[in-house]
UniProtKB/Swiss-Prot annotation:
Entry function: Catalyzes the synthesis of GMP from XMP.
GO cellular component: cytosol
Catalytic activity as recorded in UniProt: XMP + L-glutamine + ATP + H2O = GMP + L-glutamate + AMP + diphosphate + 2 H(+)
Domain of life the protein comes from: Bacteria
Gene: guaA
Protein name: GMP synthase [glutamine-hydrolyzing]
Lineage: Bacteria, Pseudomonadati, Pseudomonadota, Betaproteobacteria, Nitrosomonadales
Residues reported in the UniProt entry to bind ATP: S229, G230, G231, V232, D233, S234, S235
Amino acid sequence: MHSAILILDFGSQYTRLIARRIRETNVYCELHPFDVSPQFIREFAPIGIILSGGPASTFTEDAPRVPQIVFELGVPVLGICYGMQAMAAQLGGEVEDAQTREFGYAELLTAPCKLFHGIQDRINSDGKPALDVWMSHGDRVNKLPPGFTAIASNAATPFAAMADETRNFYGVQFHPEVTHTRQGKAILDHFVHDICSAGYDWNMPDYVEEAIGRIRARVGNDKVVLGLSGGVDSSVAAALIHRAIGDQLVCVFVDNGLLRLNEAKQIMETFSRNLAVNVIYIDAGRQFLEQLKGITDPEQKRRTIGREFVEIFQQEAEKIENAKWLAQGTIYPDVIESAGSHTKKAGVIKSHHNVGGLPETLHLKLLEPLRELFKDEVRELGLALGLPHDLVFRHPFPGPGLGVRILGEVKYEYTELLRQADAIFIEELRNAGWYEKTSQAFAVFLPIKSVGVMGDNRSYEYVVALRAVQTEDFMTAHWAELPYTLLSRISNRIINEIRGINRVVYDISGKPPATIEWE
């Protein structure tokens, strides 16, 4: 059993980053809504608790409150932004609407304390240690609770961080979880290892053996059915479950006709031939295209593709004798987004295709071996299981596939043109060493024609857009500044090698305001 940090979520857009940063220090943690029950917290038995930021103000009537048990367990507590303000307000301090709001970079001067011990960005002209941090707050603590002292300040925020070192209670008004706070990771590392006394016991080699043991204990001699998509999550889940129970795993691979070039062949070679996994291949491309006829709305396309997949998968799963379990590649961000922790006020932010749905219709028990892992941990696990590097580190691909990379109605002709254009784009990125420098790259088919000149003749053909972004967390993204020579080479190849496309454009929109996918 791992020692664990509990993170209580008060609604900050950065909360997930806290969990990722803690995991990066080789410490296990879980993220749960702020209103979990005292019994849940007691049974979780955390060695430390982190209170996240959030959009609320502590002095409003319906302000979220920290469960009182947090301050009674006798474990270290770190409040971040709103978490610090809530801690201050509930322990006898005061919070006010700040006259000077801080959004962005700020410099803080720090005082000696365990949390900041040995951590600084520089020594200022007065000989005091300074930190460059990222602020995002409109309220501030204006009176410290009894027993607390100020451990960081600037002109706008006299109590930018506070500490009661007797109880190991700390609060920081800034966000140590974001990369903009240069020493943020070191501060969180100090908190979990030096203050909470956490060990370094969260790593993938150990996790593989633990996960295999858990799968065997749960499944016994039953068969497990898994919908294999070829994406990183389902692929790693399949490899892990197969390592645990061998031929008891049966994978169903539904080729919906909306995959990338040669993707179906690669998936079958990797799993059926190389890993000896039992894979049932269903060629359903025509069926999906028939159902998509005349549909132009992106959400309706998603629903149609999802519904068709469920029907086909269910038909095949029902043929498998002694199948008692449905395995899914659900990962921790899916669980967080769907408010997967069962708490009294946990609202669903959005439904996710991997959380819920199929088990009820199939009357199967659910097996989610990656449920507690972040994406980077899933990739690390995939390598530990021997999956090919190219598969483990391939860019994200949407569940509906090319169906949402073709604007408007999906037609067979469009899928063929897009497949070829996308393959050229990715091949050239790999050849130029840019594939792993980008977080996601793909082509988009625009169902409009433009005039061109091919030799001495006028052409009137389709347009393809290229999209490549760089991001750490996919919450925000910057368009990749690919070299002009590379873009020129890609454009020339697409236009010269693919009959039907005579214009290529490059998308230079960031997220926000644009999303990464076009639909």
